[in-house]
């Protein structure tokens, strides 16, 4: 086997600060995502006083809030949590697409990892499945991805 330097992130959140953006729209689903993210970070060493939850109206507002948080310099990582459920109009496509693009730009422009926990589903049932039932909890997954990315970036 070839021996090459490998950089991996450790799942240790001690001493790190995180902002969690949570939409109020579909809050009965988003609250489960938030609970999963907070629990994950706490179990991995992050103190609750080092987590800030920022409630916003909906997914479309995520990028501007993430940008402000990233520019503040107070957070090692940002976790964006929300749920956009497809309806009968193209509204879903516009909101989900713009939020996704905006969050990616914020992460790239600022250098602050932004975890993508925005559910984009065809039904309420699918959203519930991804908020802690059959398909796991995407809030946990977004928190884990941000934590690992923060720790990788410290080594680059």
From Swiss-Prot:
One of its GO terms (biological process) is riboflavin biosynthetic process. One of its GO terms (molecular function) is 6,7-dimethyl-8-ribityllumazine synthase activity. The active site is at residue 91. One of its GO terms (cellular component) is riboflavin synthase complex. The keyword Nucleotide-binding does not apply. It is an enzyme of class 2 (transferase). Keywords: Riboflavin biosynthesis, Transferase. It comes from the Bacteria. Its EC number is 2.5.1.78. PANTHER family: 6,7-DIMETHYL-8-RIBITYLLUMAZINE SYNTHASE, 6,7-DIMETHYL-8-RIBITYLLUMAZINE SYNTHASE DMRL SYNTHASE LUMAZINE SYNTHASE. Catalyzes the formation of 6,7-dimethyl-8-ribityllumazine by condensation of 5-amino-6-(D-ribitylamino)uracil with 3,4-dihydroxy-2-butanone 4-phosphate. This is the penultimate step in the biosynthesis of riboflavin. This is 6,7-dimethyl-8-ribityllumazine synthase. It comes from Nitratidesulfovibrio vulgaris (strain DSM 19637 / Miyazaki F) (Desulfovibrio vulgaris). The lineage of its organism: Bacteria, Pseudomonadati, Thermodesulfobacteriota, Desulfovibrionia, Desulfovibrionales.
